[in-house]
Amino acid sequence: MADVVLRNVRKTYPGGFEAIKGVDFAVGDGQFCVLVGPSGCGKSTLLRMVAGLETITAGEIEIGGRVVNDVEPADRDIAMVFQNYALYPHMTVYNNMAYGLRNRGMAKAEIDARVQEAARILELGPMLIRKPRQLSGGQRQRVAMGRAIVRHPKVFLFDEPLSNLDAKLRVAMRVEIRKLQRRLATTAIYVTHDQLEAMTLADVLVVMNGGQVEQIGSPLDVYAKPATTFVASFIGAPPMNLLTLAHDLRSQLSGAPPEAGILGVRPEDLVIGPGTAAQGGLALDITVEAIERVGPETFVYGVRAGHEARPVVAGKPGEGAGGDVIVRIPGQAAPPVGERITVVAPPHGLHLFSADGRRRIAG
């Protein structure tokens, strides 16, 4: 086991494109860290830099107290699980798991003991003589994890390992990965664009955007107190409502500081009716434009009077902070499309951000 520390890590490609712009964070010994963000944010590039598959332009990466900037991937004592499994199709499951150990010159008895141990942990025993084409997607992913386990690494690295699986299998494998990491107590860094995956797996969540870290914290802290409007709109489904703090809204929030320019409220913190909010709270008149019933809850999509509906764009308050409002209500009862309703939020459900969306002010 080992901690992983990144200090002012940068990556600039030929031509001047800066993919990673001075990233700092630490993953404690035995922690499960998830890097999450949209496509192109730099999360996979950063993971590959930790693995040694991408060079570092500047900064330091430390694993277990050792700076590894110039250390070859095979000598970093890490194991990586890829999105596409990276299994040898002509080899059995047993040989896929044993291959790397044989290349390192490990004794046959030790190889067998490690493969059998991993097969027992992952319930792969009956499949050891099969080849990858005879396995389901979930079974192939377990073999890929088994190949990582047999190395007894200090750090596990996961690069979107579940993205090729169907929704039901993703949930099952997500649970299995978390159980496995806790059982082995090995430090892990996991990359995903799926915020639900990130929230359920992480001890430490690192939200990335444009090659930079937007926020670091526990999943619940990041959800409850997003540092920027990007985090507010990216973490959470449906996303946080972001509204420009114009005069009509500011007049309801007597304590709002003058530097606040955007008001945020989670869909679940809005309640339909009554017509007035509690002292310090918020009341909005909206016209219902769409309803989504998803079983135990319903999403009501509306637009404020005098505003046009606009798509919410994560991290771009000028485009996303408009008149659109999403309300999350329990059950299936909902007002009809076209009806004008009032929704209210209590003071503790309100979040204030700077006008550029880069700074949390209150809430």
Curated annotation (Swiss-Prot):
* Database matches in Pfam families: ABC_tran
What keywords does the record list, in alphabetical order? Answer: ATP-binding, Cell inner membrane, Cell membrane, Membrane, Nucleotide-binding, Sugar transport, Translocase, Transport
PROSITE patterns in the cross-refs: ABC_TRANSPORTER_1 (PS00211), ABC_TRANSPORTER_2 (PS50893), UGPC (PS51315)
Output the Gene Ontology cellular-component terms: ATP-binding cassette (ABC) transporter complex, substrate-binding subunit-containing
Swiss-Prot/TrEMBL GO biological process terms: carbohydrate transport; glycerophosphodiester transmembrane transport
| Topology term for the membrane | Peripheral membrane protein
UniProt-listed Enzyme Commission number(s): 7.6.2.10
Q: Which residues cross the membrane?
A: none
GO MF entries:
ABC-type glycerol-3-phosphate transporter activity; ATP binding; ATP hydrolysis activity
Q: Which reaction does it catalyse?
A: sn-glycerol 3-phosphate(out) + ATP + H2O = sn-glycerol 3-phosphate(in) + ADP + phosphate + H(+)
| Role, per record | Part of the ABC transporter complex UgpBAEC involved in sn-glycerol-3-phosphate (G3P) import. Responsible for energy coupling to the transport system.
Q: Could you give the subunit structure recorded for this chain?
A: The complex is composed of two ATP-binding proteins (UgpC), two transmembrane proteins (UgpA and UgpE) and a solute-binding protein (UgpB).
NCBIfam families reported for this sequence: PRK11650.1 (NF008653)
Q: What is this protein called?
A: sn-glycerol-3-phosphate import ATP-binding protein UgpC
Species annotation: Rhodopseudomonas palustris (strain ATCC BAA-98 / CGA009)
